[in-house]
């Protein structure tokens, strides 16, 4: 195979991945959890989209997140934060999934968005 076809193959792979990442939302799809209360009761790997505030940093990349229904731990890697400062008054939308282990549940955050 010639190298001139490599960009075309890479583009096809990229666009097909973006389409798959959107996910299925029709009948039989796993519903997205939208509150801390529901996330605390959800199964492992349940998708979540939560809106509220990051109250404090507990340690490392573990933070306490709060919405109108309660609070829980969330894990946010530095590269997942937006390029602006966030404090305990900033409303954010967290997208991720429930991470359940022997100690309890936390949210493994994949994306942080500031709500204006």
Swiss-Prot record:
Signal peptide as annotated in the record: 1-21
Cellular localization per UniProt: Periplasm
Inactivation phenotype: Does not affect growth at high Ca(2+) level. Does not affect the basal intracellular concentration of Ca(2+), but impairs recovery to the resting intracellular Ca(2+). Increases sensitivity to tobramycin at high Ca(2+). In strain 25W, increases sensitivity to tributyltin (TBT), cadmium, mercury, acidic pH and hydrogen peroxide.
First-listed, main subcellular location of the protein, grouped into a coarse class: periplasm
Gene3D superfamilies: Bacterial OB-fold (2.40.50.200)
Keyword Secreted carried by entry: no
InterPro entries assigned to the protein according to its UniProt record, in alphabetical order: BOBF_sf, BOF, Ca-regulated_OB-fold
Keyword line: Periplasm, Signal
A Gene Ontology BP annotation from the UniProt entry: response to cadmium ion
GO CC terms in record: periplasmic space
Miscellaneous section: Strain 25W was isolated in the ocean, whereas the reference strain PAO1 came from wounds in infected humans.
Function: Plays a role in intracellular Ca(2+) homeostasis. Involved in cell protection against oxidative stress in strain 25W.
Protein name as annotated: Calcium-regulated OB-fold protein CarO
């Amino acid at each position: 195979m010639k190298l001139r076809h490599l960009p075309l193959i890479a583009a096809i792979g990229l666009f097909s991945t973006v389409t798959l990442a959107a996910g299925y939302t029709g009948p039989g799809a796993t519903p997205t959890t939208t509150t801390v209360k529901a996330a605390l009761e959800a199964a492992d790997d349940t998708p979540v989209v939560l809106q509220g505030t990051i109250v404090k940093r507990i340690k490392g990349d573990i933070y306490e997140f709060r919405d109108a229904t309660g609070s829980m731990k969330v894990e946010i890697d530095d590269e997942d934060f937006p390029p602006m400062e966030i404090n305990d008054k900033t409303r954010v939308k967290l997208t991720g999934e429930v991470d359940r282990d022997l100690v309890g549940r936390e949210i493994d955050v994949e994306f942080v968005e500031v709500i204006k």
